[in-house]
């Protein structure tokens, strides 16, 4: 057993001098491997007298357990030292300023929409919203749009099939005017409200997309008149484009839900004499407007003998294109960062 004590002391000393895990495994194999010195002692138990085997076997197993414990401690010590060295090497100076990350920005349509809402809110308009899937009544009938009107045709409107795939009275709203109908049903006049939101029409080209954004406005009280309508819209356009000298004009037009009706033009913001944007006329059509038709009031139980009102509707993408000088509407929907970063 003297040899065993010497072997144990020698192995532990070698373990403690080892500084590398790979080298430690080699030392382990030397003493505890399949052909290791301690393993050979266990194999040699058959050569000693039977009465001495139990004591010898117990002593060898104790030595083996001691070596395995020493090996485990040394392995942990090497790993801890290696981790400490790695942490020191990779130490970060937390007092240094961080690396800047790219800042996002609002989409140009969002910028234009927020500007429109802010300008109308500044003169007392409330913002209202409503469902994008509407019924035939709110989208057409309540707005004095008869069944024979072209807007009801399949090629102009996205209709939603019923559960069985048949015809349905539901559709994707073609304007945000239904929001105004719903608002009038639950809010007695006087009132001033704008209805921004997405609308849908079967159209797609350089200046139209199947989905776009509109803001429609409504003012109802006992003294609303066309003069006030012209003043509010003229003032809005001058502030939106930040041009006090922006010329405007109103042309007679027709909309089923207003009478009289008009379309508003502004002087071309791209030129002064004529260009491709304004078709060389010097004018740009920007919105439709008019005095609310009595039949619309009738559908929402408002006394048209007591109250009068005016309404208007404008396309957000249209104004954004003019404000930012964009010549293709589809650029707003392609999510090209080269385009969007220009508005940050």
UniProtKB/Swiss-Prot annotation:
Its cofactor is Mg(2+). It is an enzyme of class 6 (ligase). InterPro entries: aa-tRNA-synth_II, aa-tRNA-synth_II/BPL/LPL, Phe-tRNA-synth_IIc_asu, Phe-tRNA_ligase_II_N, Phe_tRNA_ligase_alpha1_bac, Phenylalanyl-tRNA_Synthase, tRNA-bd_arm. Pfam families: Phe_tRNA-synt_N, tRNA-synt_2d. Binds 2 magnesium ions per tetramer. Its EC number is 6.1.1.20. It catalyses: tRNA(Phe) + L-phenylalanine + ATP = L-phenylalanyl-tRNA(Phe) + AMP + diphosphate + H(+). One of its GO terms (biological process) is phenylalanyl-tRNA aminoacylation. One of its GO terms (molecular function) is phenylalanine-tRNA ligase activity. Keywords: Aminoacyl-tRNA synthetase, ATP-binding, Cytoplasm, Ligase, Magnesium, Metal-binding, Nucleotide-binding, Protein biosynthesis. SUPFAM superfamilies: Class II aaRS and biotin synthetases, tRNA-binding arm. Mg(2+) binds at residue 259. GO terms for cellular component: cytoplasm. It is found in: Cytoplasm. Tetramer of two alpha and two beta subunits. Belongs to the class-II aminoacyl-tRNA synthetase family. Phe-tRNA synthetase alpha subunit type 1 subfamily. This is Phenylalanine--tRNA ligase alpha subunit. The gene is pheS.
């Amino acid at each position: 057993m003297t040899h065993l004590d010497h072997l144990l002391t020698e192995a532990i000393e070698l373990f403690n001098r080892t500084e590398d895990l790979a080298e430690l495994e080699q030392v382990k194999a030397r003493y505890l491997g399949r052909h290791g010195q301690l393993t050979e002692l266990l194999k040699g138990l058959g050569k000693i007298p039977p009465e001495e085997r139990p004591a010898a076997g117990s002593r060898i197993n104790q030595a083996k357990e001691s070596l395995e414990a020493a090996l485990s401690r040394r392995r942990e010590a090497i790993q801890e030292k290696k981790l400490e060295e790695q942490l020191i090497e990779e130490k970060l100076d937390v007092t240094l300023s961080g690396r800047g990350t790219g800042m996002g920005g609002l989409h140009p349509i969002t910028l234009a929409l927020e500007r429109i809402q802010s300008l109308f809110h500044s003169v007392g308009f409330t913002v209202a919203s409503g469902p994008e899937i509407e019924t035939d009544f709110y989208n057409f009938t309540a707005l004095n749009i008869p069944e024979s009107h072209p807007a009801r045709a399949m090629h102009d409107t996205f209709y939603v099939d019923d559960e069985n795939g048949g015809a349905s009275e539901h559709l994707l709203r073609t304007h945000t005017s239904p929001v105004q109908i719903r608002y009038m049903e639950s809010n007695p006049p006087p009132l001033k409200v704008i209805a921004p939101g997405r609308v849908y029409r079967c159209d797609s080209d350089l200046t139209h997309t199947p989905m776009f954004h509109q803001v429609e406005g409504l003012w109802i009280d006992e003294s609303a008149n066309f003069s006030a309508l012209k003043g509010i819209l003229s003032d809005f356009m001058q502030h939106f484009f930040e041009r006090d000298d922006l010329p405007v004009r109103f042309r007679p037009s027709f909309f089923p839900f207003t009478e009289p009706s008009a379309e508003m033009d502004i002087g071309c913001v791209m030129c002064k004499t004529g260009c491709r944007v304004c078709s060389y006329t010097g004018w740009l059509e920007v919105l439709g407007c008019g005095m609310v038709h009595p039949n619309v009031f009738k559908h929402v139980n408002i006394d048209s003998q007591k109250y009068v009102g005016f309404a208007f509707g404008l396309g957000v993408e249209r104004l954004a294109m003019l404000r930012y000088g964009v010549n293709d509407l589809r650029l707003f929907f392609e999510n090209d960062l080269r385009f969007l970063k220009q508005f940050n």
